[in-house]
Amino acid sequence: MARVGPPLDRADERPEVFAMSPHPDGSTASRCGPTPSGFPVADRPWSVETHGIDVVPDGDRHGKPTDLLWLWSAANLGVIGIVYGAVVATLGLDLLQAVAVTVVGTAGSFLLVGVLGIAGQRGGEPMLALSRRLFGASGNVGPSLVSWVSLVGWETVTAIVAADALLAIVPSLTHGPAGRWSAVVALAVTTGLSLAVGRLGHATIIVVQRAVAWIFGIATLALVGDLAFRADWARAAARHPAPFGAVVAAASVVIASAGLSWVNVSADYTRYLPRGARGRAIVGWTTLGASTPLVVLVVLGYVLSSPTSTLASSPNPVEALRSGFPGWAVVPYLSVAVVGLLAQMVMGLYSSGLNLLVLGIRVRRSRTVLIDALVVLSVGGWFMVAPHDFLGSFVSFVELLACPLATWAAVFLVDMLFGGSRDEPRTAWPAGGSWAVGTAVGLLFTASPLFTGPLARGIFVGSSLGYFAGFLVSAALFAAVRAGTVVRRGREATTTRRSVSGELPPR
């Protein structure tokens, strides 16, 4: 049914309304069309975005695929990429293997993110809202809940690392230690900064990420250049090749840490693109923007580490890397680290808020990010203050969610290959069943500190290949179902056509 509410002239005065359907969209009735600034009233920089999970009308579509280059570049400037490189080093790969695994794993996984982004440009809805066309409103609860927990979980981990970096700036400037409760204050600052941008919405995020990509991208390049100049490249080049199993394990780690962790948000940032935007441009700029900084950081992390390095297992990787810089570069390094991590948080916070709307939380989009920020602040504050060792287990739990996210992406990708679903299905069992079976199979082959499946043996030990097995199973099952549906409909159409033409007697 149509949304209600008269169009008003000012976006900040328009009451946000919900679609008259079982799920809210958190949208606001808006006047379509661009303002003199080139942005539509519903999505202007430094104003609260008024669309929720409703379909973005053609009059509100704006931007170009090259915007994705800066958006994804900023999101992958975080120093966590250096830690991924350290993990690759601990698996014993030589330099050539490490570079190949990093390039192929990073570009390949973000290629999937770019392809899924085409669905957002075509459908005009966020990622998990589009998923309802496959799973149905009730069947989509599972994937949406997994997506939300994964996003909020990684936001919490990122906020903690950013807060640690912010705390490290204090003794660098004052030559004194930060207080015990300073950790909570630092966490509140990092979360608050992310909230301020995420609350405003899509257009503001695009503008901010572009600035971050340019300004802090150059700063990151300078700091990376300093590290690369002082790195022991001869030691890295002298390493011996690792066996095939180690290469596969390293590739699985890179894929899971790179694009796979973003598959559930891709359409959130392409739904405003004009319908005339080319799909190849969406895929290309997404892949290039995300892969370029991350490949550089991962390879650098590999060179800086050794098979016995403690960087990969450090509870505070920012502090561990800090010792590699001269005194004058410590504060600039920490500042760049904080901003790079905040750029990741902003995108996660915005998308997790959209996920809450898909789950049926009946509040404005601009308020869903506040709910997520409170969760991040509460959970993150507990981890930073309380004396416990649960953070490692929490990270392992969030990493486990890569399996159901991968299987969901497999189902969605297959549906796109078959032309996409335009309406919610009569039954959700084909998509939901394929997702559930693939997830179960993937977990059977998964090995992690928190959970080890009964079939996680051989090459599956010490790798993240479980999600890959689940991906293949879900894709194969759903492809078989969709192919069967296409064949059946083709036969029905042929029978109907022959009946109408008189070749067959009527039933």
Please place each PLM-identified region on the residue numbering.
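C-terminal membrane-solvent junction of multi-pass transporters and transport-like membrane proteins
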Residues: 55, 215, 408-480, 491-495
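Transmembrane helix-loop boundary segments of multi-pass membrane transporters
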Residues: 89-100, 104, 171-181, 203-212, ...
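Membrane-water interface regions at transmembrane-helix termini and the short interhelical loops
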Residues: 90-91, 117-118, 134, 142, ...
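Transmembrane alpha-helical segments of multi-pass small-molecule transport proteins
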Residues: 144, 172-199, 214-225, 255-266, ...
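Hydrophobic alpha-helical segments and their helix-loop junctions in multi-pass secondary transporters
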Residues: 159, 164-167, 214-240, 255-260, ...
